[in-house]
Every structure is written in C-alpha cells, then in structure tokens.
C-alpha cells in the first residue's frame, strides 16, 4: 500500500502519525473538535452485556463473509483497540491497515500474523493519507456515527478503494423496532455513550449515503432484534443461552420485522469497476 508521505507526519513505534497534535477540523467554515482518544474498554463497561458482545461477534462474521472475503488489502477505519478484525481476515489478505484518530486504539491494536503487512495510521477518515485505488475492502465498525463529516469519509473510502472493492459499515440502528416502542411510550433512557455520537443513523441513511457517493449493489443485513432487560442480559453467559438468543434475535425476529428494524446492522456496497 502506498501512503501519501508528502503530508506532514511522524513515524514512531510502528505508527504513522498524521495528526501532529490536531484536535479539530473545519467543516462548512466551522471548526469542530475531533474525538482524539476515546480509550474505551468495553469489557469494563457496565452497559455492555454478554448478549451485546455476542451480537458484535455475529456482526464481525457478517463483515468477514460479505466484505473482507478474498480481499488482499483491507482498511479498518476506527479499528484497533479491542476490535477483533484480525481474527476474521481472509487467507489471501496481504495488507491490513488500521486508521484511527485515537493513539490509544492504535497502541493497543491486535496485530494479525507476521505474514500480513500491518499499517497503523493516526489520521482522520475525512482526510486519509492513502493514495488513490489502494484498497480491496474497507470496514467502518461502529465508527461512522463518531466522525465529523460522514459524507466526506465515504467519499474518501470511494477514492482509496480499487474498482470492484467493497465497503462495509456496522452501526447501531436509531430506527430499530424497540427504540420506536420506547419512544412511543416516552420512556426515559439514559446512556453514557450519547455524548460521543455525532450522528444517529438508520440503515436507510447509510444506504442513501453510499448510493449518493457512487457505490452500487448496496445491501443491508439487520441484526440484534432481541432486546431484554439488562438484569436478564447480564445473566446470559452460557454458550447455549447465547446461541438461543442469537437464533431468536437474528433469524426469527428478522423474518418478523425485516432488515431495517434491528438494533444493529451491516450495510455493504461495491465501488463499480471502471469501464
């Protein structure tokens, strides 16, 4: 993979740092702070239950199957930290790049086997220091709602992807059936993560964004349809219980509600090949 090394950067401890202490970017003539270091360890977060982690693993497998499979070069935007992408890489993968604005995530990134060239880049998704047409597959795992300019990030993805390359975006769904129920009942829900989210996407929002930028074959797979009280979810640790939860959540309830009403989703698409 070829980086744009003409951009100002430092290289230290295996990390290309293109941020140089930058803490904000300008969008529409307005300076907006960047999420520089979230430093979030989900294992110690009381909000995160075994069923949520199990749902994330299911999403990871969907990304591996529908986006990363047979890709020689992969870019993970917002990866690193506790991300498990390295476990799902294709046998043909030769290059794996993690791009994140947070140095903590890069320092703590899980690195794949030595036969895969790994690049760690501290930079924004809105201005990636990667030359055109370098990547076969891009994943944006639960990150697009944290960026400043979502459309610019998708445009940059389109630029660095090879023709025929794929992009996969995973997110929580603001239009899930159970969020609608909570809203209609006017139940107050507090979250210790809302202040980190700049957007609250639906799957349709992401589909439209990808299509507008030029991606084709846009598809969505809804997941995480079963939502139980936290007290119950915290007790569901046995593999048989988690397997039953996954079957109900991602098979039975998906058939009932359709692909756009799950609590999470994967939307993926392809950059068309040049004619």
Give the role of each language-model region:
Residues 75-127:
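Class I SAM-dependent methyltransferase SAM/SAH-binding core
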Residues 182-186, 219-275:
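A C-terminal cap/extension of S-adenosyl-L-methionine-dependent methyltransferases
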Residues 187-205:
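Acceptor-substrate binding/catalytic loop of class I
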